[in-house]
């Protein structure tokens, strides 16, 4: 297994697909990395030479923010919003949707599992 940015990427997959295992590298970024280094689309990780792996590693380290650095930056951005006390920060603090989605119904992913209210019973007529 090749180790890139602290992640063991699978050897039997194509390079464009395998690079996506690194947090912060998606389809377009993986494709642009392969284009810059002139790695063919059909080439698999186990077919890469040591020199090509080193070039990929150097390119990612120099130009991209991935893995721990990216996670830390995202967490710091959210913490900054919460410390400011702005609307988005308050929504993060309360664990509610941040981008204007409705919360009367839905938003279960952000709010957690629905809890029934004890003592509230249906009235029969």
From Swiss-Prot:
One of its GO terms (molecular function) is tRNA binding. The keyword tRNA-binding applies. Gene3D superfamilies: 1.10.8.50, 30s ribosomal protein s13, domain 2. InterPro entries: Rbsml_uS13_C (IPR027437), Ribosomal_uS13 (IPR001892), Ribosomal_uS13-like_H2TH (IPR010979), Ribosomal_uS13_bac-type (IPR019980), Ribosomal_uS13_CS (IPR018269). One of its GO terms (biological process) is translation. Keywords: Ribonucleoprotein, Ribosomal protein, RNA-binding, rRNA-binding, tRNA-binding. Coiled coil: none annotated. GO terms for cellular component: cytosol; small ribosomal subunit. The keyword Iron does not apply. PROSITE patterns: RIBOSOMAL_S13_1, RIBOSOMAL_S13_2. Transmembrane segments: none annotated. Pfam families: Ribosomal_S13. Located at the top of the head of the 30S subunit, it contacts several helices of the 16S rRNA. In the 70S ribosome it contacts the 23S rRNA (bridge B1a) and protein L5 of the 50S subunit (bridge B1b), connecting the 2 subunits; these bridges are implicated in subunit movement. Contacts the tRNAs in the A and P-sites. NCBIfam families: uS13_bact. HAMAP family: Ribosomal_uS13. Belongs to the universal ribosomal protein uS13 family. Part of the 30S ribosomal subunit. Forms a loose heterodimer with protein S19. Forms two bridges to the 50S subunit in the 70S ribosome. This is Small ribosomal subunit protein uS13. It comes from Gluconobacter oxydans (strain 621H).
């Amino acid at each position: 297994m090749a180790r890139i940015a602290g992640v063991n990427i699978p050897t039997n997959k194509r390079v464009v697909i395998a690079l996506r295992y690194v947090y912060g590298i998606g389809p377009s970024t993986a494709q642009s990395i392969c284009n810059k280094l002139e790695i063919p689309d059909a080439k698999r990780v186990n077919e890469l030479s040591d020199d090509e792996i080193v070039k990929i590693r150097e390119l990612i380290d120099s130009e991209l923010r991935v893995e721990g650095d990216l996670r830390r930056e995202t967490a710091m951005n959210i913490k900054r919003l919460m410390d400011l006390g702005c609307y988005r920060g308050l929504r993060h603090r309360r664990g509610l949707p941040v981008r204007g989605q409705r919360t009367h119904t839905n938003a279960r992913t952000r709010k957690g599992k629905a809890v029934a209210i004890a003592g509230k019973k249906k009235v029969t007529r």
